[in-house]
Amino acid sequence: MKHEPWLKQWLPLIEACPRSMAWDIGANDGTWTEMLSALFVNVVALEPDERCEPPAGHTYDRRAVWSETGEETLYRRTSALQTSLLPVHDIGDGKAKVEVFKKATVETVTLDDLAAEHGPPDFIKVDIEGAEVEAMAGATLPCFSRCRWLIESHGVSSGVGCQLQRLGYINCHLIKHPHPDAAEGHEWIFVEP
């Protein structure tokens, strides 16, 4: 949370959930991985951009979360913060223009398959640069209706909301990005059962 201090207000709700398993989807520099490791018995961190190194004592699953398990193209941008499975991603990094400089094929995994591998999560943080709706489409198991989610939305809050409704969530907390240079539609969504 060091890069997103305005999210600290939600920490008590994260701490209030069962503490067995947390997932950090889009781990990037590992800030959330480290914080979640202090709160949860197990943390699964996924980060497909190999420029992003995990914090000491942690490892990253290098797959990307998507609607289907298989392979997809990863669009690496000049800023690793903006790497995405989407060829066009205009939201994030303030008003800076970030170009795709390299494409790579990466393995993908659904949230359902992650649950089969690791067990059901109690908390899921998602920050995958616009691919949130596609990733959530791969969550169909009942366990995804019983956990807490914090999703960074990059202009797709309506689609994320539809996925959350499909999972049975009724009340969503929408957290607008407070930075004056934040792009329109750059926000977080927190839900709990």
Which stretches of residues belong to each language-model region?
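Phosphate/nucleotide-binding beta-alpha loop and adjacent structural elements of enzyme active sites
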Residues: 1-193
